[in-house]
Amino acid sequence: MPVTSTDTVKDMTTRATQAPRETASYAILETAREQVLERGEGLNESQLIHILELPDDAIPEALQLAHEVRLKHCGEDVEVEGIISIKTGGCPEDCHFCSQSGLFDSPVRGVWLDIPELVKAAKETAATGATEFCIVAAVRGPDIKLMNQIKFAIDRINEEVDINIACSLGMLTQRQVDQLAEWGVHRYNHNLETARSYFPEVVTTHSYEERLETCAMVKAAGMELCCGALIGMGESLAQRAELAAQLAALEPHEVPLNFLNPRPGTPLENQGIMDGKDALRAIAAFRLAMPRTVLRYAGGRELTLGDLGTREGLLGGINAVIVGNYLTTLGRPANADLNLLVELNMPIKEFQKSL
């Protein structure tokens, strides 16, 4: 018989619970089972800190619970997405983690893709079974030239490829939001990245409030909001819990979970790699904060978690993946993720064109 995803996690939990349990450490898991799994209410900020502080031997049970929450409140399907950068490098913002900033001595140089290349990438993405294709630009916000290119790209892709189109173009004006919605953009990505209290440590050229304004306009226009996190930048566990709670309050459709991959030439190039067990705790915590949200594996997981950790995360609350490469770093081969989903008996979400 094939091994199911639930069976695999139960095996992990059995091994963990053979050791003596520390009552105080596990109490939050009992609370979460009743509050999140049974009632569908996410953990609050103070509760999330306890998840992030769980001892190592409690991680399998936390992941098991997060997986059960995901299955009950989101279903079995895993959403697959590909991303492409229409404009790489030369960004005027100073996000300390990003090698695309033109303010740092980074090896990334400015590059524009033409429309035929975007269409080709969309076709290749759809061929993997992906239902989402996100067009990304390294900008503070789009100018008229970029908006015109986006419109042309959307039209061409829709003519030739059955896939939902998402965009990530920085901060938007109301007019730009309305245009993207009118053009049929399915989902818009604009990450909070980190907690409000830590944001000034990693970005100084724009404010947290400016990011929130774009997120609010996107939701009001009827597009799905994709709003994610980048963890492992030196934030405290309390700030990690703060971020999860702030994202939960925003109620995005999707939260991509990134782990810092320190890039040469950026202010965070010497930041240590996040511990894999801390990453797994974070995955469980974010799922328990947002039981109904699409929680997507995004950048840095290959470095932080490796193959085994990637598997554990998919059995611990993750229900979406980005296949292939990222914007400036290499990802896992698409087939590696797709084969893993088959092995775990996790069906890929089928394409349904948004209206």
Curated annotation (Swiss-Prot):
Pfam families noted in UniProt: BATS (PF06968), Radical_SAM (PF04055)
EC number in record: 2.8.1.6
Keyword Metal-binding: yes
Keyword terms: 2Fe-2S, 4Fe-4S, Biotin biosynthesis, Iron, Iron-sulfur, Metal-binding, S-adenosyl-L-methionine, Transferase
Domain Radical SAM core span(s) in chain numbering: 76-301
Annotated residues for binding of [2Fe-2S] cluster: 134, 167, 226, 296
Annotated positions binding [4Fe-4S] cluster: 91, 95, 98
SUPFAM superfamilies: Radical SAM enzymes
Subunit-structure text: Homodimer.
Name assigned to this protein: Biotin synthase
